[in-house]
Amino acid sequence: MTNNFDYRYDSCISRGICSMNPRTSSLQEVLVLYLKASAHYALKLYENDIVDEKIKAMILNTISVLVSNPQFSETDFNVFTHAYNTELPRLIKEYEEMCNEKGTEPEYLKTVIKYNKELDIINAIQLGEKEFLKKVKELSQETQDLYRIIFVIAKSICINVLDLETFEIDSKDGYLMILKILDSLNVEETKAECLKDLIIEAVELDNKLMKNLRTAQEERYGKQRVNDVSYTTIPAKAILVVGSNIRELEDVLEAVKDKEIDVYTHDEMMIAHTFPKFSEYKNLKGQYGQGIENCLLDFATFPGPIVLTRHSLYNVENLYRGLLYTTDFASSKGVIQIKNKDFSDVIKAAEDAKGFKTGKQCETVSIGYDYHNSMGSIEKKLKQKSYSHIFIVGLNGYTLEQQAYFDKLLKQTPDDVLIISLSYCTQKENIVCLNACFDVFATVEFAEGLSEKYSIPISVFYPKCDRHTISQMIYLKEKFNTDVLIGKCTPILLNPNLINTLDSVFNIKGLTSVKKDLDDILK
């Protein structure tokens, strides 16, 4: 798959899409204050078997939209703060009534937020800057970084909880963990060791949620298997579906199944083609474009409406307006929100758009894997030869630098090391090649399966960063003591400070040179 594309042009980096401006950061600091207050009272109620569903939805959606999102806008901020200013006083009153009934004194949280007063943008930015400077002054760099890490893990948990909800599965333990994480921020300074323990607890739960999500997907759509996916476009009206929530792709396909409108997937949504059920939809034609790294060009050239499913991390400020839709909790300026699974506006937009006039013939790629068959092939190799080490190479990072590194790694790794590569491939006796495509669960699935069955040392390489990567790396390191190495990531997900802290606290390393990394791992 990797040789189909040229990623010299990365719009994510070159247009600043993967960076966060100070104005946005300040507004997000203020929203964290609302989250902390909400969690304090929601946790008190939860401990007494009371779940406020409105607050639950607000907290989960705020974190899934807020963390590591460079396109978070002032409009988003106003929508969220208005909702909290409406619901928080009600939540506090609910808590007071509970305390009244129990005959206990309410434990109020001290906060600079005034719930009954709307913050204008200027005052909000000033408050956010003040909160940021307070953290810099009062917290050590390591503690600040651990808080950032735990927020990224919280985002991963929230996304998994919300995705499970689309399969009508309620993950109460996931919501409870989010409340515990947020409430830990209400302590003046939690010790680094306590934060580390909380992080380890959170990543174990997150992995459980990810397993539950995969089970739900396979129960609904069938067991994953290898499948051919076409990049060919066909003359017809078309819709592009973006993101990772395949349940929402199903909703789109159901909405257009009796219409002459084709559907194409983009980026992580490609994984849907590995589930048998989606092959039954004649409207689903294949994959379009080169992924998030090239989203500006992909979106600008697609001749129809684009549906951004929940949690899609795209900056659309530079994109053509009028054909962008989202199912997310909040929508950016110019992006039309889809509510109650009503895709009628999307369908009309597709019918009115020019669509593909001639189409373009492109090659087909084989993606996906059958886990049991793949493990069988791996175990056969382990029986045939005595291997001293196992390398697992995760999903492709799609940069020339990454390509060069892993091409060299696969060639220079000694023959007594078995390599399971989920993306890059070189034909060698000690390499098992699989194209896991955008399957973020694949790396953990194989690492966990092999760690539980064999005592051979395992090293896991993460070429690509996504919203689940930090959680997965810490889980594998702490649960199975695997070596974990991470490639260069966009600063919005993992900056150099965080990499240093991951190294010092969890012994997770950044990639250096192939020779040095091999020497360090195999010494």
PLM regions with names:
Residues M1-T2, E94, E105, I271:
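Small-residue-enriched alpha-helical segments and adjacent helix-cap loops
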Residues T2-A57, E193-K523:
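Anaerobic metallocofactor- and corrinoid-dependent redox/one-carbon enzyme cores
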Residues L35, Y41-R220:
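Electropositive, gly/pro-rich neighborhoods at or near active sites that engage anionic ligands
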